[in-house]
């Protein structure tokens, strides 16, 4: 079994690193942003366009984390359903969350159009297949709830009609959300990086932040492996790649659970073959607890599928076999197709499974995008910057106190294998009952 252990999205003719490598760091700057992914660059761009000096510092290569390792599905969705949010947090908050998802998605589209980022963004819609009749019934109620909020276009597809959406007998019908789409994550990141640099953002990469110190005169000193930067304000946008090595990450890592996802991309199947399986070339998912997400690649020549990972540092044959098995469950005719690419990436969750924007000890944070960072990371990075600058734009519904700390936890998600087994059993039991 031969496959490339790297993201398919890296195979582009565009640079994924800054045009200039900094030999020295500025002594003073208005802002330091830690983390050079979608959230960090969006925050820095917002700051720079307000006339402030800003440098982004990243311990690795810019965008090397989730920003160029995701599935490229642009949903602006959150993990809890609208129904669950209304039950647990009240109707007003729940409706505001889903309304902000509409705003964030529209803002992404407008940003790509205004900045002329050719990232193959298409609002194709998404079909989510129901894994049981009870799941389909829940989707029916959720579609009704979603359509109460302006900007949502949800409708149900019965099992006998789903061949028009997806060429499979696995699902019990499903839900289509027309407002969702997808893009090429690598091309979007490359475009965002170029725009940020053009706006005056400096990016220092392969430069680890080791400490954040309070200055007696106000502001912070950012200690890095290349030197120290004095700054007025700090934005932390490290999310699922926060790590446990340095003390300054402790407050955030005790409130975030990083979870690993694994993605495969098939060999070239050809546009006709892909359309045979996915007639409307949408984004796709299912209602399993250990769910899969899948889509055509932007060139419509291959199929991408992602789900949970069994690995730590690099993809293994075990993960490829598991994901290929999931793909074949959906499309049995692909049993003999080859996998050309497989890679890993981290996503992060708060205890509430909601994204968060908050301030603590004069440091601003945007985190917890829960696997939907293609929309939320850029949007909430921008919102964190607006909050730090003091712009009076409409604040995010996610702005508030820091998320809850998890007990007996310091950033190492030791409990995830047990949770995965529990949800895998629930999925197995559900399919056996149906």
Summary of predicted features, one role per range:
Residues 1-31, 49:
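Extreme N-terminal leader/targeting segments of oxidoreductases
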Residues 35-37, 59:
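Glycine-rich Rossmann-fold phosphate-binding loop(s) that bind the pyrophosphate
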Residues 48-69:
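Glycine-rich FAD pyrophosphate-binding loop
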Residues 77-160:
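Dinucleotide-binding Rossmann-like beta1-alpha1 core, especially the glycine-rich loop
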Residues 98-102, 130-138, 175-197, 204, ...:
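Short beta-strand to alpha-helix junction loop
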Residues 106, 114-122, 209-211, 227-361:
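Active-site substrate-recognition segment that forms the wall
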Residues 144-145, 169-232:
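Helical element adjacent to the flavin cofactor pocket in flavoenzyme catalytic cores
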Residues 309, 313-429:
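C-terminal catalytic lobe of FAD-dependent flavoproteins
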């Amino acid at each position: 079994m031969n496959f490339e252990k790297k993201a398919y999205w890296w195979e582009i003719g565009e640079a994924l690193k800054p045009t200039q490598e900094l030999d020295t760091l500025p002594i003073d700057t208005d802002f330091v942003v830690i983390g050079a992914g979608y959230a960090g660059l969006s925050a820095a761009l917002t700051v720079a366009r307000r006339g402030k000096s800003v440098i982004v510092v990243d311990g690795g290569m810019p965008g090397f984390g989730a920003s160029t390792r995701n599935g490229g599905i642009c949903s602006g969705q959150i993990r809890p359903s609208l129904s669950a949010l209304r039950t647990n947090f009240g109707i007003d908050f729940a409706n505001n969350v889903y309304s902000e998802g509409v705003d964030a998605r529209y803002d992404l589209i407008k940003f790509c159009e205004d900045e002329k980022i050719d990232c193959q963004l298409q609002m194709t819609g998404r079909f989510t297949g129901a894994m049981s009749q009870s799941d389909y019934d829940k989707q029916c109620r959720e579609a009704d709830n979603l359509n109460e909020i302006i900007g949502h276009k949800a409708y149900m597809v019965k099992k006998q009609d789903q061949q028009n959406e997806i060429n499979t007998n696995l699902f019990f019908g499903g839900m289509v959300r027309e407002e969702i789409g997808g893009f090429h994550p690598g091309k979007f990141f490359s475009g965002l990086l170029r725009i940020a640099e053009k706006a005056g953002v400096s990016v220092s990469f392969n430069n680890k932040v080791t400490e954040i110190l309070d200055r007696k005169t106000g502001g912070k000193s950012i200690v890095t492996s290349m030197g120290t930067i004095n700054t007025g304000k700090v934005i932390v946008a490290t999310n699922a790649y926060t790590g446990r090595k340095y003390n300054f990450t402790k407050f955030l890592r005790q409130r975030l659970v990083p979870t690993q996802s694994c993605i495969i991309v098939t060999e070239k199947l050809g546009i006709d073959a892909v359309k045979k399986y996915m007639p409307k070339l949408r984004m796709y998912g299912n209602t399993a607890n250990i769910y899969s997400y899948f889509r055509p690649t932007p060139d419509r020549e291959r199929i991408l599928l992602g789900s949970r990972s069994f690995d730590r540092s690099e993809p293994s044959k075990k993960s490829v076999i598991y994901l290929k098995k999931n793909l074949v469950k959906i499309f049995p005719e692909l049993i003999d197709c080859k996998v050309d690419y497989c890679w890993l990436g981290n996503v992060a969750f708060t205890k509430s499974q909601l994204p968060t924007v908050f301030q603590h000890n004069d440091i601003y944070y945007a985190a917890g995008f829960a696997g939907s960072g293609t929309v939320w990371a850029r949007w909430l990075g921008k919102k964190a910057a607006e909050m730090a600058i003091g712009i009076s734009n409409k604040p995010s519904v996610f702005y508030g106190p820091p998320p809850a700390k998890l007990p007996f936890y310091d950033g190492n998600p030791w409990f995830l294998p047990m949770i995965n087994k529990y949800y895998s059993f629930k999925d197995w039991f559900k399919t056996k009952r149906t």
